[in-house]
Amino acid sequence: MNSYIVIKNSLRDYRSGRIIRKYIRKLNKDEYKHFCAVFRLNVDFSQDDKNPSRKEVIRIIDEEFNFCDLRLFYDIMTVVPNHMNVASIIYSEYEYLLKKSNYKNKKINYTILDKINKYHSIDDIIFMYLHWRKKYNNTCACGKLFKELMKYDILATKYIYNDIINTYKEGDTISINIRLKCKDDIIKHCKSSIGMFAILSSKIIDVDFDVIFFSQISIRYRLIFKKYLIQSLYLQ
């Protein structure tokens, strides 16, 4: 049974995107700088990621927060001082859309999926996968998506991170730095990193390796990897 879930039209009102594009372009330089500081935290930018352009913000919100795009934008604007008081405008003029745009809409059981599209969140996928590995360690049935991610264990153990995997023990406080690994091959970098942290998640239960992953793997790399993953699953 194909577990592909169509998600674009059922939960998303395209007016949300137009509202976001309209108001983010009206923020002045200082307001936008403040916006980026809050946005980076909500989107798990890596330590080395530079601030996004407005175009990048729109793209990330559209792809990674497809079901709650307006809610995320509104929540950020409530803490960003701005001359237009954007949060109040959205609440008063677009309350219906704001209620539809809910974080609960992002909850998808990625464990069973066979295919994804660009409106599935790569960060949600990786977060759920690493915690699934921590809890079940491949012993629970899953769809083609997680089976594809499980293949990356081999790359991590045979070619890239075998030393870290073999030496990391329960209770260790070893600092893992993967930021310079495979820097010329983004897909290989993402694959091997996912594989390593998946193996470590199944071995070491007292560490949230997803936090380390997101702090070191660029959001831009993750979005590039999502394109690869979509195509890879499509061809299976």
Swiss-Prot record:
Domain of life assignment: Viruses
InterPro entries named among the record's database cross-references: Poxvirus_Bcl-2-like, Poxvirus_sf
Name this protein carries in UniProt: Uncharacterized protein C5
Organism: Swinepox virus (strain Kasza) (SWPV)
Lineage, top ranks: Viruses, Varidnaviria, Bamfordvirae, Nucleocytoviricota, Pokkesviricetes
